[in-house]
Structures are given as structure tokens and as C-alpha cells.
């Protein structure tokens, strides 16, 4: 892994996060000896015995947060419960959530098993101003969880991002392909390519380029990503204007 976010890039002014999505990225990160304030590990890796062993070892020395799917349905409660069991077996109690349903499910599971889930909201959850952040914090508390920080929405400009705080830590995504559509419809299934395994295909658009579409078969939905990767690099004036607590870089399946 090269170009990992680290304190030397940001002069120690900001905490740093990285998002590992594949087994290869996880192995490379561990072997590199790099250290960040937070490491996100994609939920799909928790299905693999070897990955769970590596994740548990990583969690002994660094803060690890498990990401969760973009969509879960009532019929997937058992699958979701098994996923949380695998995550908890790695001594992880912090989760990057993508929807309100996951917060409710985590709260129920936490009450049954005696732990308080710590929540990091992803950029897709509604946190567009301080009032919505307060409302979300109340919802999370009622569910028996604890709001740790929020990821700033992509739709906000830099001045608006600076106004979203109210005592809650914020995270700014500096590098990644942005999810532009999340759907229960499956492109691979439409093309007759469904093999019930998580996978990626590419859609070519003459005007806007190539889009990566990730099939999340374990929870039966797909995620289309932007054709171009956002990369703000180290723009000190921009970061000072946003003033986030964390800066995040996502490694992608490209």
C-alpha cells in the first residue's frame, strides 16, 4: 500500500483514517507497519477466517472500525446478526453505519449481548446541519448506541461543512470514488452474470467515463461509484476552512 494517510502528511494537525476493502489491502497494510488513528475494515472481510484472524491482531494495536452494508432488509436479520457476531469476535465495537435501520439493529444486539455499539455515520446519512446532528445523536442514544463521530456529507460546500459539529467529532473524506447510486437492482443479474458472489463490473459512458458497479450479493444490492475519484490531497487552506477532526482515505477495488 502506498500513499497511506499518515501524520507526516498532515503535520499531526488531524487524526487520520484509512478504509481497507480487500483481503490484499488488509495484508499489505499489516505488513507495511503503518499506523493510523482509525482503520475501517469492509464488512465482507469478516466472512473469511484468515481475515478475521488478521483483523483481530490489527485491533490489538490500532483502532479498528467495521463498516456495514448500505442496505439491509428485514429478511436479512439473521445474516446481519451473524455478521455482527463475526465482527465482535475480533474485539470490535465501533461501526461505520450507512442507514438508520443498522443503528436500531445494533442497539438491539448490544442490549442482548451486553455492549454499547459505538457509531460512526457515513456521508450518506443526513447530517447537513447542527440541528440534524443533534436529532441523529438523540436517535442513536435512544437505540442504546453511542455517536462517536459523523462523516461530512459530499453535498455540502466547505463553509457548510465547518458549521456541522455541535460537539460531535467530524470526518472529511479526502480521497475515494464516491457512491452515486445504491440500488436493490443488480446489473450483473440483468446481464445474466449473477453467481451469488460479491463482484465488480464496469459500465462505459461515452460522455462521463467508466463507472465501477459493485455487487454486494451477501446483502443483495449494488453500489455504483463516480467515474472520477475525488482527491483533495493536502490543501491546507481548504482543510483549515473545513476544520475536521479526522481525514479519511478510501482504498478502492479499482
Residue ranges, per PLM feature:
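Active-site pocket-lining/capping segments in soluble small-molecule metabolic enzymes
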Residues: 1-254
